[in-house]
Swiss-Prot record:
Putative excisionase. InterPro entries: DUF2637 (IPR021235). Pfam families: DUF2637 (PF10935). It comes from the Viruses. This is Gene 34.1 protein.
Length: 145
């Protein structure tokens, strides 16, 4: 029976939580952006949130992956985030200031949760790499000695 350390359990729970809440944020933002698009005559309004909020996901991953030219990924990330917040706020505008503030939360959380998931993944990779960094054969000889 394998016993997981408290850190590994916390890491797995935090990762699952960020993915789940990020998915909910995406869903809320999707609804607002698609309704805003439909109200403004976009025939395939369901595609707009996929492009905008999908851009947040793609650009976040690109900021992690690109060591060179990272400025471009960051520019796309900022642009996608601003478009999503603006669209969500515009959708809520008829309902007043409080609704507009609430509407800004899902796209901002989508951005934050995506970045947090990447950080958690990196942490898992770094903590897991310690145990597999030395060759298996060497580990076996070291334990026998």
């Amino acid at each position: 029976m394998k016993i997981l350390s408290r850190d590994k359990v916390a890491l797995k729970v935090a990762t699952a939580g960020t993915v789940a809440v990020g998915g909910l944020a995406f869903s809320l933002s999707f609804t607002a952006l698609s309704e805003l698009s439909a109200a403004n005559g976009v025939a395939q309004s369901w595609m707009v949130p996929l492009v905008i909020d999908g851009g947040i996901l793609v650009a976040t991953m690109a900021t992690v992956a690109l060591s060179r030219h990272g400025w471009y990924a960051w520019a796309l990330l900022i642009l996608s985030s601003l478009m999503s917040v603006a669209g969500n706020v515009a959708h809520a505008q008829p309902h007043g200031l409080i609704a507009m503030v609430i509407a800004a939360i899902p796209p901002l959380w989508l951005l934050a949760s995506t970045h947090l998931t990447v950080l958690l993944y990196r942490e898992a990779q770094e903590s897991g790499s310690e145990s597999i960094s030395e060759p298996l054969l060497t580990r076996g000889f070291a334990e026998a000695a």
